[in-house]
């Protein structure tokens, strides 16, 4: 895992709500040092859904539905209840229910589950089949935060079916065949503390080469990556990754503005495989933040939690994500530690001494590691 070392931007000001909520939820979040969430974007079904939160009321708009749906979120702590605002009203689309759940958990990040009363039996059945809601002893269905965040359709447009398992041998390493490289928009997520939408898209060499070349020649990037050079060198670099079935390149953006380059890879076929007991679906990643204005704690938290989430969503069989930052890259190791990555060991690669770190799927989802940790 490589990333440019220098962090030059102070913590960004969180998104400020435009209205003043009057509910007890506002006081609870203010006491915890978080801004009250009055608006939210959810991408259920690959489409943007705007959610307005006013006290105990939620309004969901967007997607294929022509009208908004209205919900109430009552209770507090572990006793939250989400239900349609009007009994007997036309059932809300399933995507609206997912968007309402997404917003409810974002507004109450301390909550691991809540009671849910969908108006549509078919929507309830779909949520139950996906594991988003589970029957409780009292006969009430409970929506679970950790299983909701494992639903690819909330963050990945056009989710392909999982790749059937068949094995191959590459340079003496026996591993599953990998799915074709993804293209286009790969992941989208609203970041509440920035008030902006984070996205991953596939890198397009002709479009992104000048930007990639500029980033690689930035002194703060070059000190870590050591890949300075001209356009020809960097085209060859990207074409090499495009030919490698175990890696793919991505561009990260905030509200459509590109700021970082990522490489995602399967570790079983990678250079770190000989240094630990690699499992068939372990993933790893590299990053460089090319735009100086996007370096800093608030941005690092956004992209670090998002790359982990994206890789876990790509395949439910991925149980671990690995990293190998330089041993002297203390800031990045601290960031990884705060994001749930555990130190495994130190080891030597040809170009660096590295710290092997690992994030477990259960730890990420159960402990809600998509939110900032202090």
Which ranges hold each PLM region?
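Conserved acyl-donor/pantetheine-binding loop and adjacent beta-alpha core of acyl/acetyltransferases
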Residues: 268-289, 293-295, 299
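C-terminal "cap" of GNAT-fold acetyltransferases
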Residues: 149-155, 349-374
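Conserved N-terminal entry element of GNAT/NAT acetyltransferase domains
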Residues: 1-49, 162-206, 368
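A short, internal acetyl-CoA/4′-phosphopantetheine-binding micro-motif in the GNAT/acyltransferase core
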Residues: 81-95, 285-297
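Conserved beta-hairpin
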Residues: 4, 14-22, 27-78, 82-85, ...
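Conserved beta-strand-loop-alpha-helix junction that forms the acyl-donor binding cleft
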Residues: 116-125, 322-333, 347-351, 362
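Conserved GNAT acetyl-CoA-binding A-motif
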Residues: 104-122, 313-325
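Conserved acetyl-CoA-binding loop-helix of GNAT-fold acetyltransferases
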Residues: 92-106, 296-312, 334, 338
């Amino acid at each position: 895992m490589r990333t440019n070392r220098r962090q030059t931007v102070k913590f960004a000001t969180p998104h400020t709500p435009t209205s003043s909520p009057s509910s007890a939820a506002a006081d609870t979040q203010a006491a915890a040092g978080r801004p009250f969430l009055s608006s939210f974007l959810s991408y259920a079904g690959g489409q943007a859904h705007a959610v307005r939160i006013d006290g105990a009321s939620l309004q969901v708009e967007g997607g294929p539905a022509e009208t908004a749906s209205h919900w109430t979120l009552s209770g507090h702590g572990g006793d939250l209840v989400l239900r349609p605002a009007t009994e007997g009203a036309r059932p809300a689309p399933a995507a609206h229910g997912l968007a309402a759940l997404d917003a409810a958990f974002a507004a109450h990040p301390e909550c691991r589950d809540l009671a849910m009363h969908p108006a549509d039996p078919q929507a309830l059945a779909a949520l139950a089949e996906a594991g988003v809601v589970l029957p409780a002893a009292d006969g009430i269905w409970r929506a679970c935060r950790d299983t909701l965040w494992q639903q690819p359709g909330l963050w990945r447009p056009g989710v392909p079916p999982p790749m059937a398992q068949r094995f191959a041998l590459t340079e003496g390493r026996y591993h599953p065949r990998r799915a074709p490289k993804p293209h286009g928009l790969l992941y989208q997520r609203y970041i509440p503390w920035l008030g902006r939408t984070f996205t991953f898209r596939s890198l397009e060499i002709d479009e992104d080469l000048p930007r990639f070349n500029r980033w690689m020649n930035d002194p703060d990037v070059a000190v870590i990556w050591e890949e300075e050079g001209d356009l020809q060198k960097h085209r060859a670099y990207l074409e090499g990754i495009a030919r490698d079935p175990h890696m793919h390149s991505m561009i990260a953006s905030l509200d459509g503005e590109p700021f970082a380059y990522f490489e995602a890879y399967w570790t079983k076929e990678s250079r770190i495989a000989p240094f630990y007991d690699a499992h068939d679906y372990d993933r790893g990643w590299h990053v460089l933040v090319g735009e100086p204005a996007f370096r800093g704690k608030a941005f690092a938290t956004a992209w670090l939690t998002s790359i982990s989430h994206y890789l876990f969503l790509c395949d439910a069989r991925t149980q671990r994500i690995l990293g190998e930052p330089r041993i002297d890259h203390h800031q990045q190791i601290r960031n990884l530690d705060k994001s749930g990555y555990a130190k495994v060991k130190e080891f030597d690669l040809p170009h660096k001494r590295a710290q092997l770190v690992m994030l477990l799927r259960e730890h990420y989802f159960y402990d809600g590691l998509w939110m900032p940790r202090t």
